Amino acid sequence: NLSLSKTASTISGLAYMLNQNHLYWGATLPFSNVYLFIPLFFLAILKISRNENWWWPWGSLIGAYGLAAAETQIVFYTFVTGFLWALFLKYNTKSWKPILGYFSISAIGAILAKFWLLPVLNYLKFTTRGAALSFSDLAYDFMRIADPLRFFYPYIQLPQFTGWENLGIVPNYYIGALTFLLAIASIFLVRKNKMVAFWSGVVAFSLLVRIKWTGIFWVIHFLPGFDRFRGVFHWAFIGSFALALLAGFALDNLEKIKESRHFKRFISGLKIFALTNIIFVVIIFFIGFFRDKILNGIFKFFDAKVYQNTRQFPLEHYHGVITSEFNKFLDALSFSNYHFLISFLSVLIAILIFVLYQKNKIDFTNFKKIALVFVFLNLVLIWQGYYEFISQSKITNYPNTVSFIKNHYPQDYRYRFFRFYPPESYQEFGVFDVKDWTDYKLK
């Protein structure tokens, strides 16, 4: 439908469905319902612009599905981006059909989904979304300085430099090493391909909105509808879809990209990046030999410069936290860590494939075949062990607190107990301030 080859379409599909954001939220039904809705909604508008009239009713059903079943904030962002998509297609086709189709399927979809929308709108005034949220409550997950590393190393977490998955600060960027490099290479097509230019703009916005100092999230907070939603990570759903499409466009047009006078510089940049990765890993390896001396130096600095600004728990507490995080840092970048090993090899092999193609060691046809196999293996191997298993005893055996409650309440009162704290409970116990993520564990 976007004039992509079967190989490019397959790679885009793999990158979209198996990207990190989908893996992270896949177990949550409203989020998993978004996966199908996003591509189908854009597809419906595209089909309508091409005079395929069957997509008017199909598009209405897709709109209703999104409104009734998917996560509202992401659906809202999809509708906003969908309007821009319709404007883009109107400009390309010189027809008003994309605009008319967009408003028609949106309106009819809303009517079909009214069984859910009307009760929600009626109840909305009793919720925190009944009025505009203050900006200080809106964003808590802006991109940290080292978060871009997760485009290549999806499991890496560096204290104070990356977001923390276990705290809901979700830096989910990974779509595969080669697919991300292909998406970057699509920049060479921006002036030649309007479709690539549009989706490149979507990617750029979805990334810039997550950077605090750009002020974009603050600006759109003043627009109707946007002021009811919080958390910039929701834009990752749109961004990952756009990145996957760009990877497909780049693959099919790689011969044109190779003709660019800047392509050699691109390859040189990849070589430097590969060498930097290797050097960094070697440095981390040798740091392990001086672990104790480095930790002692960190302890001295913390005791002299940082301790007075904390809650001044016993020093042993802070030293234990520092040791724990330092060990996690070393382990995260160790070849004994399966996920790091796969990530590291994926980066080097992806760059090697580009280098061999640039040097004419492999032709375009073989590049596509190798890319398909590599992307599949990369995305399958990298997510092995992503979902951790919980011991059955954690569920079937009552903790002491639950046993006490069950033994001291009347037997005819039927209670069900869930032993795990919901995500927000750490706020209630003062582990850290939700508006200040920098003090995790150190206060």
Language-model features: locations:
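Conserved luminal/periplasmic juxtamembrane motif of membrane-embedded glycan-processing enzymes
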Residues: N1-K443
